[in-house]
C-alpha cells in the first residue's frame, strides 16, 4: 500500500479500501513516513494489526511496532504474520501523535487526536489511519475426488480417457 495522506493532523481517516495480501508465516515491512502537524514538532506513533479479525487491537501481539519520537522521518516496522487460523480482510491501524512531553508507550489503538489552532486540546493531536490487509493461509487444504475415485492431488498410470476432478477447499467451496 502506498498512500501519501494529507499531512495534516486530521484525527481519523478510513483507508480500508486500500489493501494488500499477506500470507501467514511470512515476514513483511511497513515503511511509514511520519510527517508532523506543522513547525517540525516531534512526533511518534504505533502500528496495530487485528490478527484474529475480532474488530479490536487489544489482543496479545496486535501492537506490531513503535514509531520512535523524532522529527519527520521514515521508520521501517518489520512483522511476521502469525499462524492464527483467521483468514480474510482485517485492519491495520497507524496512530501518530505530536508528543508534547508524552511517551510513545502511552499511545493506544483507539486514540483519535484533536487539534485546534493555535491551542492544543488534550489529550493530544495527530492522526489515526486504518488500512486493510487480507490474511491468506500458508497452505491450501483441499480434498480431491477424481472421476476414477482417486483422492490424491495427482494421479498417474492412466488410460487415455477424459478425467474430471472435484476440488473442495477448507471452506467447503
Question: Model-found features: residue ranges?
Answer:
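Append "Rare intracellular matches occur via the same short Y/T/C beta-strand/loop motifs
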Residues: 29-32, 142-144, 161-171
Amino acid at each position: 500500500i502506498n498512500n501519501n495522506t494529507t499531512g495534516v493532523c486530521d484525527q481519523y481517516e478510513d483507508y480500508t479500501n486500500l489493501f494488500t495480501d499477506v500470507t501467514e508465516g511470512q515476514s513483511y515491512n511497513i515503511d511509514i513516513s511520519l510527517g508532523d502537524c506543522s513547525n517540525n514538532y516531534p512526533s511518534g506513533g504505533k502500528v496495530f494489526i487485528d490478527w484474529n479479525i475480532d474488530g479490536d487491537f487489544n489482543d496479545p501481539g496486535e501492537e506490531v511496532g513503535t514509531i520512535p519520537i523524532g522529527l519527520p522521518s521514515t521508520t521501517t516496522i518489520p512483522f511476521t504474520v502469525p499462524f492464527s487460523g483467521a483468514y480474510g480482510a482485517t485492519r491495520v491501524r497507524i496512530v501518530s501523535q505530536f508528543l508534547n512531553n508524552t511517551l510513545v508507550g502511552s499511545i493506544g489503538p483507539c486514540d483519535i487526536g484533536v487539534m485546534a489552532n493555535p491551542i492544543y486540546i488534550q489529550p493530544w493531536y495527530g492522526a489515526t489511519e486504518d488500512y486493510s490487509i487480507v490474511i491468506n493461509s500458508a497452505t491450501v487444504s483441499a480434498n480431491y475426488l477424481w472421476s476414477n475415485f482417486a483422492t490424491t492431488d495427482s494421479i498417474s498410470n492412466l488410460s487415455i480417457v477424459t478425467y474430471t476432478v472435484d476440488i473442495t477447499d477448507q471452506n467447503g467451496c
